[in-house]
């Protein structure tokens, strides 16, 4: 039975510096844990074939589909500010699948064994972190945030050693590409200018049609990546998503969210929110994400300098001019998104102050971020100390006055809010509940019901009510781990 794979592997035609050909390491007993049916349909794949013994063997790395050219990608990165050589240490790119509609996507196996870039690691992944990536990436997709996606997770029938023995798994990740800021840093540091140019031309061909018309195609590349990242990070902030590990190797050229290791969603609103156990200094805190985005983009610009202009001073001036636009573009996307969350379609001078005052009140009263906007959308002001305060009532009057100045009806304004304020997000305690049932009890029904609720986050359906509930009070802050 044919699964429908159609591989055409353009990355494998880049100079060999950018990859090492390597096969996934077979696993003992691959068994399908979860298959993303809607994504399989979108990719033009046959679900029955994917669920078959041969299909599952592909997901486990035990069988290579026809046309695939497995390889591990080379890249570098600034990890918590320190530059290092990296590469796919536990992932193998099977190749690029071209869908019936002509879309080209990477098909990567994560947890598929050692590669030349493993640096002492075992190349494997645990079931818990792979299911976490599946849940959160699907939630992000449903929220309308550009992201890599997960086609399948298989258990391996093997255990791996981390702090304890854990069940092994392999995740099949689907991405527009796996080109990263760190890929360009690697080329600039260790490649020739011809190799750097080949990579840049490839990125333009793959992601930015229309580059032929640009006066300076490499400046165009920089500007396009800046715009996509400004919009992406604004979208993160608008839903309270904390990535947790914004190293330059985890910033994509495509503008998709990648690497869900220590990520989490904010409950109580605070700019200082950090979940990652290794982010002890708060470098990647919620409120710092826009700044780190700019820092990473500056590293991207540095990598492109030899291509921007032969004259170094001119190249630096061009790069700086593009980078200066980032905070403006980020602020534009964030402010228009915040207006939408408050039902505002038109721009007025006092909007920024209105938004800032609400966020200040939320922080002062330790209000839940998602549920505050949910309450504003529904007009139901119960269950939070914030709503009992005189300051909030005064703010609410100002907001209602501002809403009355819109040219659209009040109903249309509230409909706008519904489209921008999710009723449900993957709350951390619910993610843990789903993972515990699946990993420890082999019960995937909790995860399936959770994914169903997350699949339409703006529905405001009765079935979503329980997933909007806050976690029980705890003395211990929620902590995440990268899973490597």
Curated annotation (Swiss-Prot):
Group of enzyme by EC: transferase
Residues passing through the membrane, by range: none
Keyword Phosphoprotein belongs to the record: no
Region (Disordered): 463-484
Presence of the UniProt keyword Nucleotide-binding in the record: yes
EC numbers on record: 2.7.7.-, 2.7.7.108
Any GO MF annotation of the entry: AMPylase activity
Superkingdom of origin: Bacteria
Residues engaged in binding ATP: 87, 89-90, 110, 122-123, 173, 180, 259
Catalytic residues (positions): 249 (proton acceptor)
Family: Belongs to the SELO family.
Function: Nucleotidyltransferase involved in the post-translational modification of proteins. It can catalyze the addition of adenosine monophosphate (AMP) or uridine monophosphate (UMP) to a protein, resulting in modifications known as AMPylation and UMPylation.
Name of the protein in its database record: Protein nucleotidyltransferase YdiU
Gene from which this protein is expressed: ydiU
